[in-house]
């Protein structure tokens, strides 16, 4: 028997064994080994924090140093302080342990509750939630006790952050340990349709309730969930191995009636190139209720996100005893195909497909192997590990310890919970019936005094709540000892407090767009709702580095799963005075101010006319400057007629603005001082000697382009369906060549910004000003005006985004580049040719606009474009469509757009 025949026989045996059970699949109950915080397997360099009262890293590990990690700032009320652990590789974390500050038995700080956030790539952070949507985890009740908490569901993560909580200003300290094992499967995310609901005698919810990615337009992408949590469903899909969950919890299911194609398509992304031998899918076959095994599976492969699917797909028809109603694992041979991305289609053989787990048998492949025919996308930045030696998604690393036993969800636990609830109810009744003195007596009986002096804890010992005392302490409680101030050497004498609460300095102001608190959920599943793709990281400043060409640090996201808008990634476009701010390239310190020196403007020469808009920390005013020619020290334009005032826009920072807001305001001044172009508003001067800080820029006498064009009629009434209300022309008119001249000036100004690698991020007619002889200048304060509030989509009540002008990659990924400005220019050109009589995508709601961005990404021909304006020639409309190309590199540069509009547009038909 040859090697090829032997290999085929082994694979067939594997497939046959998989039909009965997923024997090689990992058991999450055994993945509970201490990962190394207490025994220092995790080095100091992998432990960091938002701030720390003491520089001692030993405190983060155990009872050394100050006895625990204590944040320098108060955790109340913002809850922004965190302790971060970098595991260097992906791990499945199933259990966490916490303890308060030790300090030789003198510490009294601990955290009563905390939250967890985790990341697989260091860019996108996700908040851990239990199966009912609760984020807050109960912590310690005293500084000595160790509290172990099972994470249900477990999380696949490389980086984990602990966020302690408090209900008032107080000192909080933590010692932590993580339990789990190495994630060997290499699966980073899967994309699948949203699970559906089966209606029997009761509703059976077959949604992926623990999925930690995003949901847009009925598609889940960018995360992991129940199909990769190690929990295999029961034969009766209405029952579950978990307690207090809804019917159907263990399975994700789809109805044949909802898929006209006859199959469910899923895509899987892995950490690096792998040679795939087989895929195991645990399916339900309770055919009496409509669940059937797949009729067949078809898989395609590719090695990179931007590459085409390679070769012929692997097809496998599933047979076997389909009449047996037991759930089972079916194995699909994959023939050793090499890929990072798999797209598999599961064919319906009955009314429903129900999956509880999907795993892969694969080996890591060297990227530079000659057998692969070239080089491919680099492996992720975490250290590579040896290939798996058996069919398991996890490698158990005992580190010389025993795994922590899992608390079984037995009837005894349920009975204890019921007894506790009854006791609490009785206590409440007694409290309502008895006097206050009796209530205090009951409370005093419940108080306990800690008599122990010193404690040594090993969090790897099994148990749920562990209290270990090494030796008896004194009868009187030890004196309180504060954590050492940073830089002070240790001392042995304890410090007795004066009885007042320790007020810690608040951290610097930072706007967070992620919302952590959610209302409690009942035993039912979450209500289906439109999930807006949001990038939930905000910055204290508003200047963002645009994308530059070159090799990325990490492989780009797969192109068949709608990308996330980076969680930890909402970019706020709004500056401190309400207008948008330019995204500027990364420059060395001080380079932003390399423009001409700013000119101090005499505040007394400004005469207020009206308020144009406002933001969180400032306002934009329209002012006049009388006799500007008298201000010889200022670089004013010379086209202001003598005796006429000069119109200027004045951005004013309120005196009560935060320090960060003041810094952002001064950054904006430096950036504006660099802009010198006839089609960009210029910085004329500043008032920064005293409050309020002001910057003075150009303003044009005809106002913004949107209001200007909407008051005009098109001269060429012969153009069929020209914008208008069908009545005789009233008011001023404008010609089609003049509209092209207006658009060419906008393209010229954007061409100048592109040469500086500046990104505008809010290009629209509302942000263009009109002067004499149809002179156009691009501005930046349209976002601050209440007049245009309907043009912006408000995210979580804070950030505003002009989604109707934004490219799809801006909406889904927060990626702003010069190419995304080209997209916005195409929409602006559409506005100009419509004479600003209609809002882009006016027939769509904001949610439908976001869904349309997802259609652009999926590129399946269902995306919607703006229609051709009646007065727009076909050749010019084709130029607009090029601006809205899916691939950013296919969009024309601004130099080409300006040349076409200035020279060739009149010749188009």
Swiss-Prot record:
One of the GO biological process terms: regulation of extracellular matrix disassembly
Residues carrying covalently attached carbohydrate according to the record: 207, 256, 366, 390
Region (DS-like domain): 188-363
Topology of the protein relative to the lipid bilayer: Single-pass type I membrane protein
Leader sequence segment: 1-18
EC number: 2.7.10.1
Enzyme class: transferase
GO CC aspect terms: plasma membrane; receptor complex
Binding site for Ca(2+) 2: 226, 229, 231, 356-357
UniProt modification remark: Autophosphorylated in response to fibrillar collagen binding.
Residue span of motif PPxY motif: 477-480
Binding site for Ca(2+) 1: 207, 226, 249, 251
Pfam families (alphabetical): DDR1-2_DS-like, F5_F8_type_C, PK_Tyr_Ser-Thr
Modified positions (Phosphoserine) in chain numbering: 627
Disulfide-bonded cysteines: 31-181, 70-173, 299-344
Catalytic activity: L-tyrosyl-[protein] + ATP = O-phospho-L-tyrosyl-[protein] + ADP + H(+)
Family label: Belongs to the protein kinase superfamily. Tyr protein kinase family. Insulin receptor subfamily.
Function as written in the Swiss-Prot or TrEMBL entry: Tyrosine kinase that functions as a cell surface receptor for fibrillar collagen and regulates cell attachment to the extracellular matrix, remodeling of the extracellular matrix, cell migration, differentiation, survival and cell proliferation. Collagen binding triggers a signaling pathway that involves SRC and leads to the activation of MAP kinases. Regulates remodeling of the extracellular matrix by up-regulation of the matrix metalloproteinases MMP2, MMP7 and MMP9, and thereby facilitates cell migration and wound healing.
Protein's recorded name: Epithelial discoidin domain-containing receptor 1
């Amino acid at each position: 028997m040859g090697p090829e025949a032997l290999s085929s026989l082994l694979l067939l045996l594997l497939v046959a064994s998989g039909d009965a059970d997923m024997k090689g699949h990992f058991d999450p109950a055994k993945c509970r080994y201490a990962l190394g915080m207490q025994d220092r397997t995790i080095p100091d360099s992998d432990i960091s924090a938002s701030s720390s009262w003491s520089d001692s890293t030993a405190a983060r590990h155990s009872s050394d140093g100050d006895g625990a990690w204590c944040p320098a700032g108060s955790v109340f009320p913002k809850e922004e302080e965190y302790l971060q652990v970098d595991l260097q590789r992906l791990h499945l974390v199933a259990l966490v342990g916490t303890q308060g500050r030790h300090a030789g038995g003198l510490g009294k700080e601990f955290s009563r509750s905390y939250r967890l956030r985790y990341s697989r790539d260091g860019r996108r952070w996700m908040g851990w939630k239990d199966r009912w949507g609760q984020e807050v985890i109960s912590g310690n009740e005293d500084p000595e006790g160790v509290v172990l908490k099972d994470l249900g569901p477990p999380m696949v993560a490389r980086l984990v952050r602990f966020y302690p909580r408090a209900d008032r200003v107080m000192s909080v300290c933590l010692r932590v340990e993580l339990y789990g094992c190495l994630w060997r499967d290499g699966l980073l995310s899967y994309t699948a349709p949203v699970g559906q609901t089966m209606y029997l005698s009761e509703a059976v919810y077959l949604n992926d309730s623990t999925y930690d990615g995003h949901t847009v337009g009925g598609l889940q992408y960018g995360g992991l969930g129940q199909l990769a949590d190690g929990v295999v469903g029961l034969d009766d899909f209405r029952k579950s191995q978990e307690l207090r969950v809804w019917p159907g919890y263990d399975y994700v299911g789809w109805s044949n009636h909802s898929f006209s194609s006859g199959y469910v398509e899923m895509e899987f992304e892995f950490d690096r190139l792998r040679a795939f031998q087989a895929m195991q899918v645990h399916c339900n076959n309770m055919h009496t209720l409509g669940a059937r095994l797949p009729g067949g599976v078809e898989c395609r492969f590719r090695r990179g996100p931007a590459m085409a699917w390679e070769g012929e797909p692997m097809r496998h028809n599933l047979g076997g005893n389909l009449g047996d109603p037991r759930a089972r694992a079916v194995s699909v041979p994959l023939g050793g195909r090499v890929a990072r991305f798999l797209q598999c289609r599961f064919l319906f053989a009955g009314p429903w497909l129900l999956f509880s787990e999907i795993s892969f048998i694969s080996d890591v492949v060297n990227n530079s192997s000659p057998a692969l025919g070239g080089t491919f996308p680099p492996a992720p930045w975490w250290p590579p590990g040896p290939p798996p030696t058996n069919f398991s998604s996890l490698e158990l690393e005992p580190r010389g310890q025993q795994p922590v036993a899992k608390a079984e969800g037995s009837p005894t636990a349920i009975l204890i919970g019921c007894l506790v609830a009854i006791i609490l109810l009785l206590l409440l009744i007694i409290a309502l019936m008895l006097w206050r003195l009796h209530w205090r007596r009951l409370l005093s009986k419940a108080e306990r005094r800690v008599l122990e002096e010193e404690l040594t804890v090993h969090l790897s010992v099994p148990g749920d709540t562990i209290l270990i005392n090494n030796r008896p302490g004194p009868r009187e409680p030890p004196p309180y000892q504060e954590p050492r101030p940073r830089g002070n050497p240790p001392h042995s004498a304890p410090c007795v407090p004066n009885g007042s609460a320790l007020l810690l300095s608040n951290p610097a102001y930072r706007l967070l767009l992620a919302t952590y608190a959610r209302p409690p959920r009942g035993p039912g599943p979450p209500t289906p709702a439109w999930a807006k793709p949001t990038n939930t990281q905000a910055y204290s400043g508003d200047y963002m580095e645009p994308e530059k060409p070159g090799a990325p640090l990490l492989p780009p996201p797969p192109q068949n799963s709608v990308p996330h808008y980076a969680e930890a990634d909402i970019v706020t476009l709004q500056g401190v005075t309400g207008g948008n701010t330019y995204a500027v390239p990364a420059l060395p310190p001080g380079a932003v101010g390399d423009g001409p020196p700013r000119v101090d403007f005499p505040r007394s020469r400004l005469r207020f006319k009206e308020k144009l808009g406002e933001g969180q920390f400032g306002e934009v005013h329209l002012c006049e400057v009388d006799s500007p020619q008298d201000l010889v020290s200022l670089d004013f334009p010379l086209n202001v007629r003598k005796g006429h005032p000069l119109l200027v826009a004045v951005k004013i920072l309120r005196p009560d603005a935060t320090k960060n807001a003041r810094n952002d305001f001064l950054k904006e001044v430096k950036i504006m001082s660099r802009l010198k172009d006839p089609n960009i508003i210029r910085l004329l001067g500043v008032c920064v000697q005293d409050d309020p800080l002001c910057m003075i820029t150009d303003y044009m006498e005809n106002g913004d382009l949107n209001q200007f064009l909407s008051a005009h009629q098109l001269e060429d009434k012969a153009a069929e369906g020209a914008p208008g209300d069908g009545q005789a022309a009233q008011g001023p008119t404008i010609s089609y060549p003049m509209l092209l001249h207006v658009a060419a000036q906008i393209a010229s100004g954007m061409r100048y910004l592109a040469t500086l690698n500046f990104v505008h991020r809010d290009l629209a007619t509302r942000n263009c000003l009109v002067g004499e002889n149809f002179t156009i200048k691009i501005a930046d304060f349209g976002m601050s005006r209440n007049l245009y509030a309907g043009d912006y989509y408000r995210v979580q009540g804070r950030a505003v985004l002009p989604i109707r002008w934004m490219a799809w990659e801006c909406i889904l990924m927060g990626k702003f580049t010069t190419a995304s400005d080209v997209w916005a220019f195409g929409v602006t050109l559409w506005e100009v040719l419509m004479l600003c009589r209609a809002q882009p995508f006016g027939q769509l709601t904001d949610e439908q606009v976001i869904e349309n961005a997802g259609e652009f990404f999926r590129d399946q021909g269902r995306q919607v474009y703006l229609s051709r304006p009646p007065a727009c020639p076909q050749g010019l409309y084709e130029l607009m469509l090029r601006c809205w190309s899916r691939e950013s590199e296919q969009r024309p540069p601004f130099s080409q757009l300006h040349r076409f509009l200035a020279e060739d547009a009149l010749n188009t038909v």
